[in-house]
Curated annotation (Swiss-Prot):
Name of protein: Beta-lactamase OXA-5
NCBIfam families (alphabetical): bla_class_D_main (NF012161), blaOXA-5_like (NF040527)
Signal peptide start-end: 1-19
Organism in which the protein naturally occurs: Pseudomonas aeruginosa
PANTHER family on file: BETA-LACTAMASE YBXI-RELATED, PEPTIDOGLYCAN D,D-TRANSPEPTIDASE
Active site residues per record: S67 (acyl-ester intermediate)
Organism classification: Bacteria, Pseudomonadati, Pseudomonadota, Gammaproteobacteria, Pseudomonadales
Length: 267
């Protein structure tokens, strides 16, 4: 394991609590190799203000966020009134959608859990470009570039974010430190709970830009945090993807690494 102090200035703002130290654990690469995947995993421990990754260079490289952007999109929607509250029902118009689980009325939590793209495209259109740009700037979210269309800039447009920036944003959300109401931050945090056991709770969101090609692969994400006792572990995973069959690797690799670190059960 080697310390990569030079990356601190590159990937974190000085005010970020998780910027005290960054180290590389190259042993994690075996999990990527075993599944023939090229990617990165970042794990940050709140109590020690430290982060570990298998690839510091890739961790500071920005990629399109895809559906991980549903986290800030939901918060911005709540802040602007595009989403009234967590009980608002987003009506299905009866038209066929890309995925069957999207073809029903959904509330906020349900829309996030099934990653309903049409719902969040509707939210983004109601927020509008001016307010969307304002909040991405306030959140220091990636490059904050909404070029490419108000309802698709995070799917196929110009928005980019690194794994390090993802954990920075998630830490701010966890601490209710984003420039948004505490009540709305709590709503979003509850909406992204994906696993709850007696030992730990996982808040997370996946993302997937599409497979791309071998020469220009797409990107698959899994980001979130684990609350375990008094400790909080923030994580961000991304990988190149040129075959949809590899999509499960985003969770399986992350789970194996976190299990090896004694954080969750699995692997």
């Amino acid at each position: 394991m080697k310390t990569i102090a030079a990356y601190l200035v590159l990937v974190f703002y000085a005010s970020t609590a998780l910027s005290e130290s960054i180290s590389e654990n190259l042993a994690w690469n075996k999990e990527f190799s075993s599944e023939s995947v090229h990617g990165v995993f970042v794990l940050c421990k709140s109590s020690s203000n430290s982060c570990t990754t298998n690839n510091a260079a890739r961790a500071s490289t920005a990629y399109i966020p895809a559906s991980t952007f549903k986290i800030p999109n939901a918060l911005i929607g709540l802040e602007t009134g595009a989403i009234k509250d967590e009980r608002q029902v987003f009506k299905w118009d009866g038209k066929p959608r890309a995925m069957k689980q999207w073809e029903k009325d959904l509330k906020l939590r349900g829309a996030i859990q099934v990653s309903a793209v049409p719902v969040f495209q509707q939210i983004a259109r109601e927020v509008g470009e001016i307010r969307m740009q304002k909040y991405l700037n306030l959140f220091s979210y990636g490059n904050a570039n909404i070029g490419g269309g108000i309802d698709k800039f995070w799917l196929e447009g110009q928005l980019r974010i690194s794994a390090f920036n993802q954990v920075k944003f998630l830490e701010s959300l966890y601490l209710n430190n984003l420039p948004a109401s505490k009540a709305n931050q709590l709503i979003v945090k509850e909406a992204i709970v994906t696993e709850a056991t007696p030992e730990y709770i996982v808040h997370s969101k996946t993302g997937y830009s599409g497979v791309g090609t071998e020469s220009s692969p797409g990107v698959a994400w899994w980001v979130g945090w684990v609350e375990k006792g008094t400790e909080v572990y923030f994580f961000a995973f991304n990988m190149d993807i040129d075959n949809e069959s590899k999509l499960p690797s985003r969770k399986s690799i992350s789970t194996k690494i976190m299990a090896s670190e004694g954080i969750i059960i699995g692997g």
